[in-house]
Every structure is written in structure tokens, then in C-alpha cells.
Amino acid sequence: MAMAYEEARKLRLQENHKRFQSNFVALPQFQLLQQRNHKPIDKALLATAEPRRSSRVRTVISSYRDDVVVDTGRTSNLRRSRHSSTWATYISRPLHECKFASYEEKVGAFKAAEKFQRSLKSPHPYFVKSMVRSHVYSCFWLGLPSRFCADNFPEETMEIELEDEEGEVYEAVYIGRRAGLSGGWKRFALDHKLDDGDALLFELVEPKKFKIYVFKGNENANLTSARKRGRATTPSEEEEEEEDKDVEESGDEEHSSRATKRSSVRLLRKRKA
């Protein structure tokens, strides 16, 4: 019974398939599809041809671009700079003026700034900042110590003044939410030719005014700048006298200790004898 049912089902499917094919071929859409010729599209023509809506043949316009050669001297550099993002393309000073400070130069400048601050004996708040390349060559964003800013500045953007050792004042913009100097700092850095490794002593002499002292990584430069600053960097006579007294006292103590040692040795020898 099941076999007869399966055979009848297969016969019915075959009849339906034949009927569907005969009806589909008779449709006009199928006849149009059969008559259509598919030609391969040339991709080279599509790449070079510009899209046009007009069916009119375009008139050929003569061009003199190939006959004239204009050398501006900057085209190659501009093309190269578009694809290169090296640090040298963003610096604001000549490349031969930019230096890479050594560890010894950075430490020497930082210690010179701290020593000068101790000799000032100023009651004003201060901090020492060591310069890096982004501070003085390219980015010109100077981040300040967060604790110093929280203690002395409000959390808002305001204008402050930067005074150098010669008394010249520069206007700058302090951004409180980022605790740093932005506008105006670039001019100060370029005018004073600050380099990588320089140490700057920032002294807040007024609520919105910094007195800035520059210390170079080169020791000779620090010596010449110290002479310009005057007696502020050299110890006073009282300090020199105190140092001499300390040296004399230490020498007397050493001499007395040696004398006591000698006397004790002599006593031991006498007792043994």
C-alpha cells in the first residue's frame, strides 16, 4: 500500500514539473531573456571615462599642461610632509638648534636651580620644572605640578604673567582644569631659546604672576648667568664664616680625638711595663 502511494506521488510531481516548464516557456518575459545578448563590459573604459548625462559628443579641448613645467621648489616637500608624521616636521625652531640633553645635563641644571632658590630665601611659593622637547620645540604645552596649582590657583581658565630675569613680562593663559600653560608660553620659550634639559625656577611673586629663572644644562652657561644674577647665587659672608667655623670645629674635634687616643695608648704601655 505504501509503495503504491509513493509511486503515485512521484508520477504526480513529474507531471507538475512538466506542466510548469511548458507554461513558463510560453511567457513573453522568458522569451525576452533568451533573446538578450550579454556583452562583457570593459573595466578599463569605466575607469577612464567620466560619467556624463548628455548624449552629445564632447568637444576635445587642448591642454598645455604637459608643455609647461613649473618648479615651485615645495611640491616634493609638501607631498612628503602629507605622508610623514615625524617629530622634525612639527618643530618651531631650526633643526640644528634642537638638542637632546643627557642625564647629567638635566640633573646639573635641576640642582643649580634648587641651589639658587635656597640662596634667594624667598617666602613666595615656588617649584622647579625640567624642560622636555614638547615644552620648548613642538607642542608648547607646559604642565605644572598639580599640588602647586591646587594650593595657589583656582580651577578656571585665567590670564597670568611670566616675568623673566631681565624684567620683561609675557602674557600667558593658565588652564585650571588641565593645570598647565598654553597660550603665551610658546613665545616665552622661543624668545629665551629654551632647550631640552633646561631647568626653570618658577616663583609665584604675585597671585597671577610668575618670576622665572632659567638654568641651562651647560655648566658654563650657568656660570655666566650666575654672574649676571649677582650676589644672589653666591653665599653671603655670614654663611662663609659659619662654614669656616664648622670646618675649624670639626678639625679641633678630630685633633682632640687623636690626642686622647695617643694618651690612652701611652698609659697602656706604662701599665704593661
Curated annotation (Swiss-Prot):
Ranges of the DNA-binding region feature: 127-218
Subcellular location: Nucleus
Organism lineage: Eukaryota, Viridiplantae, Streptophyta, Embryophyta, Tracheophyta
Record bears the keyword Nucleus: yes
PANTHER family reported in the protein's UniProt record: B3 DOMAIN-CONTAINING PROTEIN OS05G0481400, B3 DOMAIN-CONTAINING PROTEIN OS11G0197600-RELATED
Major subcellular location class: nucleus
Acidic residues bias locations: 236-252
GO cellular component: nucleus
InterPro entries per UniProt: B3_DNA-bd (IPR003340), DNA-bd_pseudobarrel_sf (IPR015300), REM16-like (IPR044837)
UniProt keyword terms in alphabetical order: DNA-binding, Nucleus, Transcription, Transcription regulation
Pfam families xrefs: B3
Gene Ontology molecular function terms on file: DNA binding
Disordered, as annotated region: 225-273
Biased composition (Basic residues): 258-273
Annotated protein name in UniProt: Putative B3 domain-containing protein At5g58280
